């Protein structure tokens, strides 16, 4: 009986330690996902215009698909790690927040394996899937963050970053409507990079909320 009790205590301790380490793993995954993006920017500085060209266009230079894929999959992993921490600390698995975080991560994975089309080229099946995945991503994460901030009242930073990301996402998606396709702004790439900066900031704030739940 004593041995069983000791084993159960050890398992409980390991579970707690793993749960406590998960937010740190999420931060590491977020940081790692930025490395390929920085490399892509440096490697394509003479061939791509970061003000005009969107991030998805990094798939076209040699090696770009691999680096961009690493960034997207690392970002998805970080998001799922943060989600798992929240689930382990009481967030219902089928709550809207949980589903939206899963959709954001799924959108990243789908967009990775269905690359975009070159700007102003006729849309392919892969390009269409990529755009729908992107739309899912840009709607899901800001809304998830906003709802989580309502659930965790102390998450002020998450609330405002989610609002800013939501407004930026809405404006960015407007530029991709079919009626506006022929008047895509020349600064679309810069605008998307600002949007991603907000999304990253939101994710770091989300991980902070998850960590506070572990520490509570």
Task: List where the protein language model places each region.
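Hydrophobic, aromatic-enriched alpha-helical segments typical of multi-pass transmembrane helices
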Residues: 13-212
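Short, charged juxtamembrane terminal tails flanking transmembrane helices
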Residues: 5-13, 211-216
